[in-house]
Amino acid sequence: MSKPIQMERGVKYRDADKMALIPVKSVAVEREQLLRKPEWMKIKLPADSSRIQGIKAAMRKNGLHSVCEEASCPNLAECFNHGTATFMILGAICTRRCPFCDVAHGRPLAPDTNEPEKLAQTIADMGLRYVVITSVDRDDLRDGGAQHFADCIHAIRAKSPQIRIETLVPDFRGRMDRALEILHDNPPDVFNHNLENIPRLYRQVRPGANYEWSLRLLQQFKQQHPQIPTKSGLMVGLGETNQEIIEVMRDLRAHGVTMLTLGQYLQPSRHHLPVQRYVSPEEFAEMKAEALAMGFTHAACGPFVRSSYHADLQAQGMEVK
């Protein structure tokens, strides 16, 4: 029996090193085995990158992180060029090791107590009117990081009273009641928690997570804050069927969720879970029609859609795909 790897606190484990720590193994895929990307998955980079560099500089200056960079989001150039970013709090090292995700795994450092103030000042300096705040999973913290979320929301509103805040939260595993109690007095304007995929594939896609637990988190927040929209996101291309995705959409509606994002999974490296299929824009359009028919008020469905992709437009009910 091999000895468990002793992780050094503050060290990022990525790609092969990260995947080696996952109990449910995935086999690295060679380049010639990868599915060829269809034409609709080709990304056009903006000609002017000055806005992109400006946002990165502001992040570095204040020691902040964006999930756009840490998770290698394909929309980074487009979003940064439009002056929007999704801030990732509680560090850049996740205590989980999901094999679809490019965020580093390891033993994170203690939360930066100055981060709420630095984040609020950066957002005020950027003049943002809508901001998305997410985080790594922090299973090492007794509240799962909920107090840090609440502190960030409070600090942001103190400096930018007119801003709308969307939070994309982890599942607060084993700490749901405590987390919701902490967030009660400083709730966001949109509460987002991603189911990611179907229950049949959860052990492979989200080791350490629980499908029913995530649904319950969304439901309990909605019960406590009926006036605040709840939102969830799913990826396709991991081995599920369109019908299984539609069943998950029904589960979300049954738990009070009114906003949906649905996008194509892209493999961050050959060590991550491989793409099993590419879903066509026409299929995304069909699933959007299904979502609206079952009562979602907002449904952003398309190959490049991510939870926070044009989140301000999503919240306004505008077309995003």
UniProtKB/Swiss-Prot annotation:
It catalyses: [[Fe-S] cluster scaffold protein carrying a second [4Fe-4S](2+) cluster] + N(6)-octanoyl-L-lysyl-[protein] + 2 oxidized [2Fe-2S]-[ferredoxin] + 2 S-adenosyl-L-methionine + 4 H(+) = [[Fe-S] cluster scaffold protein] + N(6)-[(R)-dihydrolipoyl]-L-lysyl-[protein] + 4 Fe(3+) + 2 hydrogen sulfide + 2 5'-deoxyadenosine + 2 L-methionine + 2 reduced [2Fe-2S]-[ferredoxin]. It comes from the Bacteria. Its main location: cytoplasm. [4Fe-4S] cluster 1 binds at C68, C73, C79, S308. Transmembrane segments: none annotated. Its EC number is 2.8.1.8. It is an enzyme of class 2 (transferase). Keywords: 4Fe-4S, Cytoplasm, Iron, Iron-sulfur, Metal-binding, S-adenosyl-L-methionine, Transferase. Its cofactor is [4Fe-4S] cluster. Pathway: Protein modification; protein lipoylation via endogenous pathway; protein N(6)-(lipoyl)lysine from octanoyl-[acyl-carrier-protein]: step 2/2. Pfam families: LIAS_N (PF16881), Radical_SAM (PF04055). InterPro entries: Aldolase_TIM, Elp3/MiaA/NifB-like_rSAM, LIAS_N, Lipoyl_synth, rSAM. One of its GO terms (cellular component) is cytoplasm. PANTHER family: LIPOYL SYNTHASE (PTHR10949), LIPOYL SYNTHASE, MITOCHONDRIAL (PTHR10949:SF0). This is Lipoyl synthase. It comes from Edwardsiella ictaluri (strain 93-146).
